[in-house]
């Protein structure tokens, strides 16, 4: 098993080291990740400037001056030979719950892997302490995928509570919850008195009831949410056609 590992926190992040170390027991691991933190990059692809790649001497990781999606795309199509059998993104420093997934570079890296034809997982730790716990579950899931492959149009979005391994209650299969709209934008000034803006923290939980990823984490469980690559709203196709007919 050849495993490509990437993330959005950057090639020097603690989470990607913990993940790659744990997955070496499952197969041959190659790390291709952004050269710096690219959290919130979503599925952006660099098209207008060239991508530069360097190799970190002490661990052999590839550092790409680009986005998480760039990293997976470049790795699969150029850097990693033979091609990987699987893509694992993470361990993210913080949650990717609910509508976090539309912004997450970690989820995007896994999505790019699936788009390119490989089974893919996105692993996030809901905190910044117990990376070993998240790495344990990542390795467990990778071994599971080796035996029972995932459906061709899905990735698994995995969130792990920031707890010691023996305090995690188990695993729950969940749906995405939802946050309130984030309205906080912080305005300040640069040293020259010009206005600058910071996008504030994410909104509070809105849909976090039983069955959601939020609820599973709150209860001390690992949350696993299957995400589909095909974003077509099939249930709306007939209704949309009828709506168009009403327009004359």
UniProtKB/Swiss-Prot annotation:
UniProt EC number: 3.1.3.5
Needed cofactors: a divalent metal cation
Localization per Swiss-Prot or TrEMBL: Cytoplasm
GO cellular component terms given for this protein: cytoplasm
First-listed, main subcellular location of the protein, grouped into a coarse class: cytoplasm
Alphabetical UniProt keywords: Cytoplasm, Hydrolase, Metal-binding, Nucleotide-binding
Transmembrane segments: none
Source superkingdom: Bacteria
SUPFAM superfamilies given in the database record: SurE-like
Entry's Gene Ontology molecular function annotations: 3'-nucleotidase activity; 5'-nucleotidase activity; exopolyphosphatase activity; metal ion binding; nucleotide binding
UniProt key word Hydrolase: yes
Cofactor comment: Binds 1 divalent metal cation per subunit.
Enzymatic class: hydrolase
Catalysed reactions listed for this entry: a ribonucleoside 5'-phosphate + H2O = a ribonucleoside + phosphate
Binding positions (a divalent metal cation): 8-9, 39, 92
Entry similarity comment: Belongs to the SurE nucleotidase family.
Function: Nucleotidase that shows phosphatase activity on nucleoside 5'-monophosphates.
The protein's name: 5'-nucleotidase SurE
Organism: Aeromonas salmonicida (strain A449)
Lineage of origin: Bacteria, Pseudomonadati, Pseudomonadota, Gammaproteobacteria, Aeromonadales
